[in-house]
Design a protein with these regions (language model features):
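Disorder-to-helix initiation segments
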Residues: 11-28, 100-103, 107-110
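Acidic/histidine-rich alpha-helical segments that form the ligand environment
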Residues: 93-146
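Alpha-helical initiation/capping and key positions within long helical/coiled-coil segments
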Residues: 24-27, 31, 57-60, 64, ...
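Conserved alpha-helical segments that form or flank metal/cofactor-binding pockets of metalloenzymes
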Residues: 52-87
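Acidic, low-complexity proline/glycine-rich segments
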Residues: 2-11, 26-37
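Helix-loop segments that flank and shape redox-cofactor active sites
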Residues: 35-60, 121-135
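A structural signal for well-ordered alpha-helices, especially hydrophobic packing surfaces
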Residues: 25, 29, 36-39, 43, ...
């Protein structure tokens, strides 16, 4: 017996796979990937006072985001959607500062952008809840937002906001 956990896209009816859904899905994946890369680069490159605390904070954030990425892509694929993995080019930034405070601010920017993308995708799912797949994706987006919010609070506390 073979267990096929990936959805055969030819067998799935895809009324939700319209242009709006595609844009929101791909933006969520891209912003999540970019935020994960920025957190990992910050973890590797932080220097100076508060190094150890910031190093651990960035590690927690990229681990949290990595778990979110895995769940998001698996959820989207289970519903018959393949994210555009060509978007995984990274944020396209050069890091010119390595102090903890500046890197925390940079991570805050990326997490806020991610939170916005997740919120917009969640709203789309709520507005189209007649499709049970969107109810499931919406539930997943809501859980993602809670995790992202927790990381935002940690970064803001570190930054003294």
């Amino acid at each position: 017996m073979t267990l096929n956990i990936a959805t055969d896209h030819k067998q799935v009816r895809n009324p939700i796979m319209n242009e709006e859904f595609t844009v929101y899905s791909n933006k969520s994946v891209k912003y999540l990937n970019d935020a994960t890369i920025v957190a990992r680069l910050s973890h590797w490159n932080v220097r100076g006072p508060n190094f150890y605390e910031a190093h651990l904070l960035f590690e927690r954030i990229y681990n949290d985001l990595g778990e979110l990425m895995d769940g998001l892509v698996e959820t989207l694929r289970a519903c018959g959607f393949d994210p555009d993995f060509s978007l995984f080019t990274g944020p396209g930034i050069s890091m010119e500062f390595f102090d903890a405070q500046s890197l925390v601010e940079l991570n805050l920017d990326y997490l806020m952008a991610l939170n916005s993308a997740v919120g917009i995708f969640y709203k789309f799912c709520e507005e189209n809840s007649q499709d049970p797949r969107l109810v499931g994706i919406g539930s997943h987006m809501q859980a993602m937002a809670e995790s992202i919010l927790s990381d935002l609070y940690l970064l803001q506390a570190f930054a003294g906001h």
